[in-house]
């Protein structure tokens, strides 16, 4: 399924192409050859469209690269404790149970540490304190 960013990029490139064609049409005598200029503009705009639009947002290669980057950054680092999705869900539910049973509510259960990381692969890592 096409995303909004891609459609917006296609629309903008199309509008630029239409405006350039109108410029060539009304000032055609000043240009060399209309067909040559139009084909050149089409090639340039197609190239810019391919470079400017992110066509591979959710492809498998990006997911693999993201997972390998994730492993390099967090899994081998001893300062981080990494859990799978099931482990983190179990730990989070245990934290909620502990909070409900604890009468002292002086702290918030929300962790706002910038160095915490949650990847699309459903593995969460938290920096050890």
Swiss-Prot record:
The keyword Chloroplast does not apply. It is found in: Cell membrane. Keywords: Cell membrane, Membrane, Plasmid, Transmembrane, Transmembrane helix. InterPro entries: DUF5425. GO terms for cellular component: plasma membrane. Its main location: membrane. It is a multi-pass membrane protein. The chain crosses the membrane at residues 4-24, 37-57. It comes from the Bacteria. It holds the Pfam family DUF5425. To B.burgdorferi BBF20. This is Uncharacterized membrane protein BB_D15.
